[in-house]
Amino acid sequence: AQCGAQGGGATCPGGLCCSQWGWCGSTPKYCGAGCQSNCK
């Protein structure tokens, strides 16, 4: 599911990070630069 600006402001389940592209994940690619929510 999409999150952040691309997902209408939605956050990710389970505390996952929302990447700059609006996708949920737990790796630095998602949690690092550009992260939109639940960032590390």
Curated annotation (Swiss-Prot):
UniProt xrefs under Pfam families: Chitin_bind_1
PTM per Swiss-Prot/TrEMBL: Not glycosylated.
InterPro entries in alphabetical order: Chitin-bd_1, Chitin-binding_1_CS, Endochitinase-like_sf
Residue span(s) of domain Chitin-binding type-1: 1-40
SUPFAM superfamilies found in the cross-reference section: Plant lectins/antimicrobial peptides
Protein name as it appears in the record: Antimicrobial peptide 1
CDD domains recorded: ChtBD1_GH19_hevein
S-S bridge residues: 3-18, 12-24, 17-31, 35-39
Keywords: Antibiotic, Antimicrobial, Chitin-binding, Disulfide bond, Fungicide, Plant defense
GO biological process entries: defense response to bacterium; defense response to fungus; killing of cells of another organism
Purpose of the protein: Antimicrobial peptide active against plant pathogenic fungi and Gram-negative and -positive bacteria.
Coiled coil: none
GO terms for MF: chitin binding
